[in-house]
Amino acid sequence: MDDDGIRVEDLLKLKLIVVGNQGTGKSCILNRFVNEAFEENYQATIGLDFQSKNITIHDQDVRLILYDTAGQEKFRSLIPMYIREAQIILLIYDISDKESFESMPKWIQEILDVKNSEAIFVLIGNKIDLESERKISYEEGKKFAEENNFIFQEVSAKTGKNFGTLFEVQIYEAVYNKFKSEFDKREKIGYEDDHANYDESNENTNKNNDNKVKLDANIINNNQSGKKKKRCC
């Protein structure tokens, strides 16, 4: 059992990884999603960090394993092994940093070098709270995402703006559609388990009712016997 009272072995497990240049707010995005919080002085990730979060998609429990990667060049060699296992890839750029957006093709190529395009790709423009410093327009980001068939959204890890839309609508729906057969299978198993428990409960109830009928019959017989004895006196 985990802290939510859910058996871990019953959860559908999916791996999500965030990639992008250093300083784009990758760690802050995960912290906002997992803990609904923002830390102004967040320490840069060294190498790779991970955490997990249990979510519910179409009434099914899912455990997301979240990998946070370092943006520094010296740690890039660590990333491919985790990219291979990821079902969801978040590509993060900073709307106030043109270089971070222009680095996206390089990041995508690094991903495709070790993994096919079957993963769910999500392009995220972070730091929309810095609107006055914007270098990449919404239209530029959206166009790039559409050209690559990616999900797209702009967010602010600082304020939490658009996080509900990004995760609970766009990403969750993409996950459900991508792994629908797995969701359907688990839903069927849950349905059969519920019916098995229902049948067992009914069977126990019927047994208890049978015993009650027999017990009531004995009480009636004893009462009748007692009445006869009373009349004899």
Task: Name what the model sees in each region.
Residues 34-61:
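Switch I (effector-binding) loop of TRAFAC-class P-loop GTPase G-domains
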Residues 86-105, 115-118, 129-135:
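Conserved Switch II/interswitch segment of TRAFAC-class P-loop GTPases
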Residues 62-77:
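Switch II (G3) loop of P-loop NTPases
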Residues 66, 92, 124:
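Generic enzyme active-site microenvironment
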Residues 56-58, 80-85, 112-117:
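Conserved catalytic network of the ASCE P-loop NTPase/AAA+ motor domain
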Residues 51, 76-81:
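Conserved alpha-helical scaffold flanking the Walker A/P-loop in AAA+ ATPase domains
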Residues 1-23, 27, 58-61, 117-123, ...:
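Conserved P-loop small GTPase signature centered on TRAFAC-class small GTPases
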